Swiss-Prot record:
The keyword Cell inner membrane does not apply. It comes from Oryza sativa subsp. japonica (Rice). PANTHER family: 2-METHYL-6-PHYTYL-1,4-HYDROQUINONE METHYLTRANSFERASE 2, CHLOROPLASTIC, 2-METHYL-6-PHYTYL-1,4-HYDROQUINONE METHYLTRANSFERASE, CHLOROPLASTIC. This is 2-methyl-6-phytyl-1,4-hydroquinone methyltransferase 2, chloroplastic. The lineage of its organism: Eukaryota, Viridiplantae, Streptophyta, Embryophyta, Tracheophyta. Residues 125-134 are annotated as: SAM motif I.
Amino acid sequence: MAMASSAYAPAGGVGTHSAPGRIRPPRGLGFSTTTTKSRPLVLTRRGGGGGNISVARLRCAASSSSAAARPMSQPRFIQHKKEAFWFYRFLSIVYDHVINPGHWTEDMRDDALEPADLYSRKLRVVDVGGGTGFTTLGIVKRVDPENVTLLDQSPHQLEKAREKEALKGVTIMEGDAEDLPFPTDTFDRYVSAGSIEYWPDPQRGIKEAYRVLRLGGVACMIGPVHPTFWLSRFFADMWMLFPKEEEYIEWFKKAGFKDVKLKRIGPKWYRGVRRHGLIMGCSVTGVKREHGDSPLQLGPKVEDVSKPVNPITFLFRFLMGTICAAYYVLVPIYMWIKDQIVPKGMPI
């Protein structure tokens, strides 16, 4: 579920449209840093073998921000748009059958979408970074397909989505999660699953989520959780963005969202969401309480389009990112085996 490319122009802006059948990789690599302030957050958890837990009060320190703790400029081998584009060209072949069973099951998907409150089939919903349409399949169970838009950067992923019979009425398009090609106040629900980890500037993407929602609309962001175990943290930080729970909350609040809540998710046999992280480890929701654009002001989007990519550097980054990804394919297998051995109720 890769991040969307800039194949479409934002509302009121100027952009280019790819010709049908033509595959054009995105050109940007830009990074920017964000900062957070100390604020309390509300956390609930479901899944991961633990069921519901009591609401906890956490306080995030300034040192937990992405800028202070894990600078956006540090190497992440698949977070860059170009690497992600080619990575998903090959991964799209096996994504639904190899990746999803360990990281994004149907039960997890339905559980994660519950806070989005898809109560009516008439709701207008956008699935940003929807990839092969696995999350969209969960959406169209509750919303009429003609009211749903699926947007992603990868034409290879989107081709897989177009093959799904249940998505025949869905509008499927290429686009950029940080520069959405929709007018302000368009959708009732914004959903994004497994995409934020590829965004060079997560705050900008969440600001866009706020902009395209109507008054009273709900954004539901489903993504990874930063691990606490040193080896998993090493691979996570090298691979792509695994935000801390506090960072999700802070990004939502800065964008203008109210009633921000976070829920941990995970396969029932995966008793280690916080220890090892998980590509789909939490579901964050926020409500838009005012008309119009986000109150947050950001500078121009930074894109490195002038410098050509060194093929050797690109290959190195791609291979290293693939190694990190392989680790996170093996972790669920390891956790499943441990779940069969370690008695239920005991930490693993």
